[in-house]
Amino acid sequence: MLAPKKQKFRKAHKGRVVSKSKAGTTLAFGSFGLKSIDGWRVTARQIEAGRKAATRCMKRQGRLWIRIFPDLPVSKKPAEVRMGKGKGNPEFFAVRVSPGRIMFEIEGVEEDVAVKALELASAKLPVRTRIVRHYE
């Protein structure tokens, strides 16, 4: 799974996704991409599940790029622990995905295969998405 090698701080603020994405809104590598419509927090496990689903559908042909990286540590308190006594320990990593952000890109397969692969990847993600093409 994706995780940062080094971090400046162990814990991060919860934060919100408030604005549209300014960078990463156009296709840079592939001919087909998966663009977010909602703003949401996507975990490293969800990204990995989407990657596996897409590569399995493509039968390991072509190329897949992941354009988001989970660098936000999400902390959680253990089960049945009372409120207070500080913030919990980091459990997993996530990324805040803004509306308009390209998350996955595909190149080197036919359009119907690419669309099917991106639909399968989209089903694994908590954000609403749409498929974009390079010639649009």
From Swiss-Prot:
Gene Ontology cellular component annotations, sorted alphabetically: cytosolic large ribosomal subunit
Gene3D superfamilies: Ribosomal protein L10e/L16
GO terms of biological process kind: translation
GO molecular function: rRNA binding; structural constituent of ribosome; tRNA binding
One Pfam entry name: Ribosomal_L16
Role, per record: Binds 23S rRNA and is also seen to make contacts with the A and possibly P site tRNAs.
Entry's family note: Belongs to the universal ribosomal protein uL16 family.
Protein's name according to its UniProt entry: Large ribosomal subunit protein uL16
